[in-house]
Structure formats: structure tokens, C-alpha cells
Amino acid sequence: MSDEKELNILSHLTDKPGANQREIAADLEISLGSVNFVIKALIEKGWVKVGNFSKSNEKHRYIYQLTPSGIAAKITLTRHFMSLKQREYQALKAQLEKIEAQGQD
């Protein structure tokens, strides 16, 4: 399981707390099976808790909420992901500058 999928699902749960797994899968363009697998892992880690919609006729629907440790994990994953993307950006920028310099010779 990738940190990126975990971060994307944690972010989605923050942005759309009432979303079900199908909606998450559709919004993130990943398989329903992947969403189910990641959410189960997040629950096992204690980052997400599950509840029912108490004021809904759809008692079988679940609501996924980030726990305090889930919020902390989201912050850590976001920092890690930003650092990774920053390094990728710098590497691509250096590569582009090198190609441009070669083209000017």
C-alpha cells in the first residue's frame, strides 16, 4: 500500500466526511477494492474510526472519521509527500536546464 493512497484517502475523508467507499473510489479514480483495503488498514492503524449514520434511514452506511492520530498521520504524510515532490521538481528542473544548455551549444 502506498503512502500516497493513504494520504489521498485521508484527505478525501477530511473533505467529504459522508462519502462511502464507492464515492471515494470514483473521486480518486482507484478501484473499490483498493479503497476497501486502504480503509481497513487505516482503521487497524487507529487513524480512522467507523460509525453509522445515526439520523439516517440508511443504517447500513458507514461514516469514516479521522482520529487524532489519523490527523497527525495526515500531517506527517503531507509533509513527506511535499518533500518528495519538491525533490522530484528540483531534479526535473535541473534536467530541463541541462537539456536547454545543450540546445544552445
Region annotations inferred by a language model:
Residues 1-5, 20, 51-74:
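Short, cationic-aromatic polyanion-contact patches
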Residues 22, 33:
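Key DNA-contact positions within bacterial/archaeal DNA-binding proteins
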Residues 26, 43-44:
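Alpha-helical residues within the helix-turn-helix
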Residues 73-105:
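Amphipathic alpha-helical dimerization/coiled-coil segments
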